[in-house]
Amino acid sequence: MSEQKTIRFIITRQDTADSTPYDEEFEIPYRPNLNVISALMEIRRNPVNVKGEKTTPVTWDMNCLEEVCGACSMVINGKPRQSCTALIDQLEQPIRLKPMKTFPVVRDLQVDRSRMFDSLKKVKAWIPIDGTYDLGPGPRMPEKRRQWAYELSKCMTCGVCLEACPNVNSKSKFMGPAPMSQVRLFNAHPTGAMNKSERLEALMDEGGLADCGNSQNCVQSCPKGIPLTTSIAALNRDTNLQAFRNFFGSDRV
């Protein structure tokens, strides 16, 4: 009888936000077409490490399981990505799972992404409305603009681009590429453009565009293929124009 194939994991764990991280190894039976989340569920069902010791179930975030929500981001074999689309058959073993280091660890592979959401609040990444009553159809966007704006709207706030960016870290206030790309998205909307100057001025503040080192890691790592560096370049132009308006004034009422 042939020996059963197994999958070996080395998982970086942390019991609390303030405790020291440590590595723990697990082994589960191999099944074809497994993804990392399925394997983590298997470990959770029977949390026994390779030493045969009963341990606590591994904690991580997940939701949609189809790369839409962005919740299951983690570092897999050194690369930040979604664990729901990371197929075991395509990964080198042992598979190393770590939490993203850009965000504070809550427990094990679960992180607190508040930093990113606070940046989205700072740049007003939404379109204000007066109420929930029907106002009828809004202004239409030119088709060419709609096409590139749609690409920006694919952002699922997964945090992978922030994890890949060398300028986003605990010593920096840099907001990172995802919130900046959303500024370009909402400024392109005919109604969202009403708050265009406020968003641009937020980017001109501390932690904004000036802190970008143009390493271009973000566009390489984005699971949705969003043209983040294109947005950053466009926003550099927009913020320069905004700086001139602030200095010389504008003839627009």
UniProtKB/Swiss-Prot annotation:
InterPro entries recorded: 2Fe-2S_ferredoxin-like_sf (IPR036010), 4Fe4S_Fe-S-bd (IPR017896), 4Fe4S_Fe_S_CS (IPR017900), Beta-grasp_dom_sf (IPR012675), Helical_ferredxn (IPR009051), SDH/FRD_Iron-Sulfur (IPR050573), Succ_DH/fum_Rdtase_Fe-S (IPR004489), Succ_DH/fum_Rdtase_N (IPR025192)
Protein name (record): Succinate dehydrogenase iron-sulfur subunit
GO BP of this protein: aerobic respiration; respiratory electron transport chain; tricarboxylic acid cycle
Intrachain disulfide bonds: none
Origin superkingdom: Bacteria
PROSITE patterns in UniProt: 4FE4S_FER_1, 4FE4S_FER_2
Family designation: Belongs to the succinate dehydrogenase/fumarate reductase iron-sulfur protein family.
EC assignment: 1.3.5.1
Organism from which the protein derives: Bacillus subtilis (strain 168)
Leading EC class: oxidoreductase
Necessary cofactors: [2Fe-2S] cluster; [3Fe-4S] cluster; [4Fe-4S] cluster
PANTHER family referenced in this protein's UniProt entry, alphabetically: SUCCINATE DEHYDROGENASE [UBIQUINONE] IRON-SULFUR SUBUNIT, MITOCHONDRIAL, SUCCINATE DEHYDROGENASE IRON-SULFUR PROTEIN
Chain positions recorded as [3Fe-4S] cluster binding sites: 165, 212, 218
Subunit structure: In B.subtilis succinate dehydrogenase forms part of an enzyme complex containing three subunits: a flavoprotein, an iron-sulfur protein and cytochrome b-558.
Ranges where the 4Fe-4S ferredoxin-type domain occurs: 146-174
Binding site for [4Fe-4S] cluster: 155, 158, 161, 222
GO molecular function: 2 iron, 2 sulfur cluster binding; 3 iron, 4 sulfur cluster binding; 4 iron, 4 sulfur cluster binding; electron transfer activity; metal ion binding; succinate dehydrogenase (quinone) activity
Signal peptide location: none
Pathway this chain belongs to: Carbohydrate metabolism; tricarboxylic acid cycle; fumarate from succinate (bacterial route): step 1/1
Co-factor: note: Binds 1 [2Fe-2S] cluster.
Pfam families the record matches: Fer2_3, Fer4_8
Binding-site list for [2Fe-2S] cluster: 64, 69, 84
Keywords: 2Fe-2S, 3Fe-4S, 4Fe-4S, Electron transport, Iron, Iron-sulfur, Metal-binding, Oxidoreductase, Transport, Tricarboxylic acid cycle
Catalytic activity: a quinone + succinate = fumarate + a quinol
